[in-house]
Amino acid sequence: MPTILDEIVATKRVEIREAKVRTPESEVRAAMESAPPVRDFFAAVSRPGAVRLIAEVKKASPSKGLLRADFDPAEIARTYERHGASAISVLTDERYFQGSLENLRRVRRAVGVPVLRKEFILDPYQVLEARAAGADAVLLIAECLDDRALAELYQSIRALGMTALVELYDPENLPRVLAIGARLIGINNRDLRSFQTDLEHSLRMRRQVPADRALVSESGIRTRADVDRLAAAGVQAMLVGESLVVRPDIGAAVDELLGNA
């Protein structure tokens, strides 16, 4: 039986074909010439010390629907940065998450920290789109990609000077992710097949990831106690969105998570 991830990937392949017709690759490459310089996403989220926050600009999700009605991506991103986020993640999927590349462009202009394009990346064309929109990093999801595509997309991202955040859920995918040389590895605590979350998943996986690779824990992080557990396990960064954007006072939510006075 097809999962929500299967459905999203099938939809995305159609969207990519349509995008290539609407905006040929030559036009995307031309737009890259005027894109802002790349900021060092890897350095921002892997600095020694506290667990670094990658705060996500997220309007909706397939499981929860609309998360925030008064959604202003640039203002949310500025709030995140002002309260201590080390980087910003922007969802660009339109159908399932109500995101857009325009949101990414707006966020990139609004903040001084590095910005990640969070998307179901299946084609090098999307990597070019990301850079043209000002992205400093791009997410790759191992569960969506075979070995060849994973390696090709990783190299495409690196060739443009951006950071690849390579995400996995299934531990069986870890050898594949390590084989391409990924330095920044995301552990999704949400099973993309069932959409259930389990923070323990990151803690278990930290023991399997080599110490010279930086680890990002993604999904299901809600409290300062959760952050303390990640820190104790040696996790470098966390990607948090839903538990922040649903709060009336986003800045206060970030302060609580980071333990700001």
PLM feature spans:
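An N-cap/entry alpha-helix motif that binds or orients negatively charged groups
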Residues: 2-70
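Catalytic cores of alpha/beta
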Residues: 122-133, 169-180, 217, 221-240, ...
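Glycine-rich phosphate-binding active-site loops on the catalytic face of alpha/beta enzymes
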Residues: 129-149, 186-195, 235-254
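Catalytic-face loop-and-helix region of soluble metabolic enzyme cores
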Residues: 184-240
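C-terminal helical cap(s) of enzyme catalytic domains, especially alpha/beta-barrels
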Residues: 204-208, 231, 246-261
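Active-site beta-loop-alpha junctions enriched in small/polar residues
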Residues: 11, 58-60, 93, 120-121, ...
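N-terminal active-site wall of soluble small-molecule enzyme domains
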Residues: 52, 57, 64-165, 171-176, ...
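Receiver (REC) domain switch/active-site residues of two-component response regulators
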Residues: 6, 86, 136, 183, ...
